[in-house]
Design a protein with these regions (language model features):
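Cofactor-binding beta-sheet edge motifs in enzyme active sites
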Residues: 1-408
Length: 408
C-alpha cells in the first residue's frame, strides 16, 4: 500500500485530458521507490506513445421517409467502451454506465459510446443502439477529446440528415429547421428547472437507450440551461446560415454545408450551429475551407472577448480534425511519434472564422468545446454541395474526395 502526497496545481482546464491517471501513477510509484518527491515531465515522444484517442467506430443508419418527412431513424453504433480503462481493477465503474431502457434495470451501456447520437431534431420514431466491441475497447483504449459528447456521432448524424434532405429533394436548411420545432421531448425544460438526476429523456425524443445524466449523487440543477430546447438550436442555425450567405450564387466547385450540435445528454448544453464554405479542386481532390460561420447560444455570455477566442480555437480544432489529424496503429502501438508525422492544421490552412454570440439571457454554459463539433460535418456537407462527393469518414483527405467523386 502506497502512502503518497500529491501536490496539485490549481490552474487551467484540459478539455477532459487531465482525467487520465497514468502520469500520476507513474510519479507515485517513483516517489515511493526513491523516497523523495518526484515531478514527472514527459517528452513529446513518450506523450504520443501513451496517448489515448477516442474509440474507432462503425455506424449503420436507416431512415424512414413518408410524404417528404423523416418519420423514423435507426442508428446502430459499434465501438469500444471508454469506461473500463477508468475502472481500476474492475470491469466497469458504475458511474460510467447508464441504464439500458430495454429493462431499465441493468447499467450496461457506456454513456460515452452514444453521446451525441441522439439529437434535438423531432423524429417521431428514433432508436439508438450501441454495440460493444471488446477487442476495440482494449486494443485502442479511449479517453477525452475536446468536443463535448462524441464529435464522431455528431459527424455521422449531421452527414446522414444532409443525405436524407437531398434524397427528399429538400433544402438542407429548411429540412433541418422543420425538425427543430421543439415538439415532443425536444421542447427543453421549463423555466422552473427540474430535480437533480432527472433522466435526459424527460426532455428528449424517445430513446432505445435511456440517457440519465448524472446517474447518482446530489447535484445542483441547472435551472435554465435547456430552456427553449430545439428552438434555440434552430435560432443558431438561422444565424449561421445567414452569416454564411446560404442560398447565394457561388463560384464553380464551391459549396456551403451546414451542421448543428448540442450535447443532449448534458444538463447544461450549449447550442451551436456552423456553416462551412469549401472550394474543391476536382482534379486532385484537394480542398480549402474558405470560411467558417459559427453561431452559439451560451445563455449569458460573461466575457465576450474570451468567449470568442474559445469559439475560434475550438473551430480550428474541428478544422484540424477533418483536414488531417489521424493516428495509426502498428503492432499495438501508435505509429506517430511527433508533429512531423502527426499533422495538425497549419497556418496556411486556417480559414476565416466569423463568430456570432447569441445572448439569450439564460443560464450560462460552456464555450471551450462545442464549436469543434459542427466543423467536420459542415465541411463534409459543403464538399458534397461543391462536387457531389459524399465522404463518410474522417479525416477527409484529397484521396477520399477523389474516390467519392468516382462513386458519385
Amino acid at each position: 500500500e502506497l502512502e503518497v502526497y500529491v501536490h496539485n496545481y490549481i490552474l487551467g482546464g484540459g478539455f477532459g485530458g487531465k482525467q487520465d491517471y497514468d502520469d500520476i501513477l507513474a510519479a507515485a510509484y517513483c516517489a515511493n521507490d526513491v523516497g523523495r518527491p518526484v515531478k514527472l515531465i514527459q517528452t513529446r515522444e513518450s506523450q504520443f506513445a501513451t496517448s489515448f484517442p477516442r474509440t474507432p467506430t462503425y455506424h449503420k443508419l436507416k431512415a424512414g421517409m413518408k410524404d417528404g418527412q423523416l418519420v423514423a431513424m435507426n442508428h446502430d453504433i459499434v465501438c469500444g467502451w471508454m469506461g473500463p480503462r477508468f475502472s481500476v481493477g474492475k470491469k466497469y465503474g458504475s458511474d460510467w454506465l447508464q441504464l439500458d431502457s430495454v429493462d431499465g434495470k441493468e447499467k450496461d451501456i457506456d454513456q460515452w459510446s452514444i453521446g451525441g447520437s441522439d439529437h434535438w431534431y423531432y423524429v417521431p420514431n428514433h432508436r439508438v443502439r450501441a454495440w460493444n466491441s471488446d477487442r476495440t475497447t482494449w486494443a485502442v483504449q479511449a479517453s477525452a477529446l475536446r468536443t463535448v459528447s462524441n464529435s464522431y456521432n455528431m459527424f455521422v448524424v449531421e452527414s446522414f440528415l444532409d443525405e436524407v434532405a437531398h434524397k427528399l429533394g429538400r433544402d438542407p436548411l429548411e429540412f433541418r429547421l422543420s425538425m427543430l420545432n421543439g415538439k415532443g421531448g425536444n421542447r427543453g425544460i421549463p423555466n422552473t428547472g427540474y430535480a437533480p438526476g432527472t433522466p435526459s429523456d424527460y426532455y428528449m425524443d424517445r430513446l432505445w437507450i435511456s440517457l440519465p445524466w448524472p446517474q447518482e449523487g446530489s447535484w445542483i440543477p441547472y435551472e435554465s440551461a435547456t430552456v427553449g430546447g430545439a428552438l434555440r438550436l434552430a435560432n443558431c442555425l438561422r444565424v449561421a446560415a445567414g452569416k454564411a450567405g446560404w442560398g447565394k450564387k457561388l463560384p464553380p466547385n464551391t459549396g456551403i454545408g451546414l451542421a448543428v450540435s448540442s450535447a443532449e445528454e448534458r444538463q447544461s448544453p450549449t447550442w451551436v450551429a456552423g456553416a462551412a464554405e469549401v472550394t474543391v479542386d476536382p482534379k486532385t481532390g484537394k480542398y480549402r475551407i474558405n470560411r467558417l460561420s459559427i453561431a452559439m447560444d451560451m445563455g449569458t455570455c460573461i466575457n465576450p472577448l474570451n468567449a470568442t477566442a474559445q469559439i475560434q480555437g475550438a473551430a480550428l480544432w474541428g478544422a484540424s480534425q477533418v483536414l488531417s489529424e489521424r493516428l495509426d496503429y502498428k503492432e499495438g502501438a501508435i505509429r506517430q511519434t511527433n508533429f512531423h508525422e502527426y499533422k495538425p492544421i497549419r497556418l496556411a490552412d486556417v480559414p476565416e472564422i466569423d463568430v456570432e454570440i447569441i445572448e439569450s439571457g439564460h443560464h450560462p454554459s460552456g464555450v471551450g468545446e462545442p464549436s469543434s463539433t459542427v466543423v467536420a460535418p459542415a465541411v463534409a456537407n459543403a464538399i458534397f454541395n461543391a462536387v457531389g462527393a459524399r465522404v463518410r469518414h474522417m479525416p477527409i483527405t484529397p484521396e477520399a474526395v477523389l474516390e467519392a467523386m468516382k462513386r458519385a
